[in-house]
Amino acid sequence: MRYQRPKGTADILPGDSQTWQYVEGQARQIFKTYGYQEIRTPLFESYDIFSRSAGDTSDVVTKEMYDFKDKGDRHIALRPEGTAGVVRAFVENKLYGPEFNKPYKVYYIGPMFRYERPQSGRQREFHQIGVEAFGADNPAVDVEVITMALRFFKKLGLSDLRVAVNSLGDQESRANYRQALIDYLKPHYDELSEDSKERLEKNPLRVLDSKDERDQQFVENAPSILDYLTPAAAERFDQVKEMLDSLGIDYVVDATMVRGLDYYNHTIFEVMVKAKSLGHGYTTICGGGRYSGLVEELGGPDEPGVGFGIGLERLILLLGDEGVELPTEDGLDVYVVGIGEATNLESFRLVTAARDAGLVAERDYLNRKPKAQFKTAAKEGAKVTLTVGQREIEEGTVHFKVMATGKEVSVPLADCLADFGKVYQEHVEEG
């Protein structure tokens, strides 16, 4: 039987993993400058963590989650997004305590799981980079996470990004808007999609998130939530826009944007880009916002939070589509060519000495002919080849060749084994 990877998953092979490592490394560097530290949470959590946080009417919970009963009859779900697990960890470990600085800033990088139709940039197992900041209600933190995302994308070489912002207001704002939306949609009930009919009863804001063509005309003409913000919520949103303006960030206000998860309130945002690899029109590559009630919903104190998530698959597709050239790792420093089985021990000692000196080194393990070994050394971009055969062993020497200059020299084997770094520096770095 020939086994294949599950549908909607991918093998990230060594030729591609280098790109992933670079992108993740840039994220870590950027986040560090903003005071964020890494957090790692389980790949699976209690089902209730996600149903309570994402909302039991959201597509994530009703259609996309991988959930099951384990052998202890516990209802478990593979994480479909990162925020809920981080909030659970924040509450369980009492990271809101007075001994911790506020805002408490963390980031995560890892796989998520959603059962949806696989397509370009969208898999059933996908990877996400995300940040969360807890304990500060200041709208400046909202703007900070937006600017941090933009700084990350620009560091990778992306430009012409579109930022969309909206406010979902406070609890009173949403209650007022909820009723206005129900009053607007009720007369069109029979014309809505089946999903939107159900959403209208349970969470009418979800209708605005519908991608069904039957709902689009009603979404476009729906009342704006911005007209229902309380004075305090409107003032807060004005502060966010003022700070974005002061930083020269190009943005648009999208009053129909609600995001796909129920825990957001006040500021929400998306960073979008237009690229062939991700379909027609603008595609979201980063989304997030504020969630002032989520910590309390999961059993903690009334602590505000704000964050975002970035899809790694989509981002890496985009980088390739835009022709962004990412740095590549250097090849080998040293390749040891051993001629004949009798050189096995000395080849091993030489490659070990090179690695002990902090160099990237490799050798032949297949007892191939010298020509094949030199071909491998060239393919791997080796800066130096060391050749050791029966004659070199008898003479106590090693044939040392600098590939870039063609310089060749015979070096005492004992010197290489005693201090390979010194020999390498003498013949390569000093010419």
Curated annotation (Swiss-Prot):
Subcellular location: Cytoplasm
EC number: 6.1.1.21
One GO cellular component, as annotated: cytoplasm
SUPFAM superfamilies: Class II aaRS ABD-related, Class II aaRS and biotin synthetases
Pfam families documented for this protein: HGTP_anticodon, tRNA-synt_His
Record's keyword terms, sorted: Aminoacyl-tRNA synthetase, ATP-binding, Cytoplasm, Ligase, Nucleotide-binding, Protein biosynthesis
Summary of subunit composition and partner proteins: Homodimer.
PANTHER family according to UniProt: HISTIDINE--TRNA LIGASE, MITOCHONDRIAL-RELATED, HISTIDYL-TRNA SYNTHETASE
HAMAP family tied to this protein: His_tRNA_synth
UniProt record similarity statement: Belongs to the class-II aminoacyl-tRNA synthetase family.
Protein name, UniProt field: Histidine--tRNA ligase
